[in-house]
Amino acid sequence: MEVLMLGQADVRRLLDPDRLLTALEAGFRAISEGSVDVPPRVAANTDAGFLAAMPGYARDIGLATKLVSVFRGNHERGLPSHQALICLFDAGTGSPVAIMDGTHVTAVRTAGAAAVSVRHLARPEARVLAIIGAGVQGASHLEMLSRVRDFGEIRVASRTLASATALARTDPRAHAVEGFEAAVRGADVVALCTHSGDPVVRREWLSPGTHVTSVGYAPPSGELDRAIAEEGRLYVESRAAAFRPPPAGCAELAGMAPEAATELGELLLGRARGREDPDELTVYKSMGHAIEDLVSAVLVLDAARREQIGTGFDF
């Protein structure tokens, strides 16, 4: 039995962003249809970070698990804070099929899921994007959100003006802004991409009709102002995952009723309503979901087989 190994360079080459958006939508529909099995993530904590396991199965899609380590201090060592491996298995036999880099997958699928929310919830005429956070996720959001809306202005703000400026230089539409409030006032879409344990944007800074995405994970609190979650029309990947007690669930939503949120899959299936008013505040809060990793890894593996890329080893 041969197992295919794919490094990060392979994954970067093979993971098509536009196909990923389509695959993520299929994954969200599967979640809301109940055709998935995804247990709560488990983690082993160390003094410096943690290692989490995220297994998931989706009928007619596949079976996979991701191992992801999150070590916040890695930036000081020149290493990513998030590093991951994804293992794909044959859903009929349980035999291992592929092992691939999951670090790039995690970065792109997270931003891709946010882009799905922008595609279906932001106002069609949205032209101003504010990105809060200029790290890996800030860069991924700049790429992926631009695929679903024609932004004319992109504002980037971060803890340091230097990091915001560095990211802004990668896109002619982007410019660095000093201060989070200045970045988000008047923006049509606000993307929160930080590791902050405290809210980085206040509800009163947001204009009517804003769409907010938040992908940060920093229990026991987080980057999203609770008032934004409570006052906006809230969307999540999975209520079962988002409303588990932290740290398995979303810290910013702790204590809220699960019925306060709509799953993106319900919206895509036509079972729930989306934006109904141009002045409505819409909010997407991400926890990260194993099905996002699964659909991404399946795309990569299919492309690797077509292009005969990767290194096989006998299992």
PLM feature segments, named:
Residues 121-128, 150, 207-208:
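Short helix-loop-beta connector
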Residues 172-255:
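Rossmann-like adenosine-cofactor binding region
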Residues 138-139:
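N-terminal Rossmann-fold NAD(P) dinucleotide-binding loop
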Residues 147-170:
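NAD(P)-binding Rossmann-fold cofactor-contacting core
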Residues 218, 222-315:
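Adenosine-phosphate binding glycine-rich loop
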Residues 1-105, 115, 125, 262, ...:
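N-terminal ligand-binding/catalytic initiation module
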Residues 133-135:
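Glycine-rich Rossmann-fold phosphate-binding loop(s) that bind the pyrophosphate
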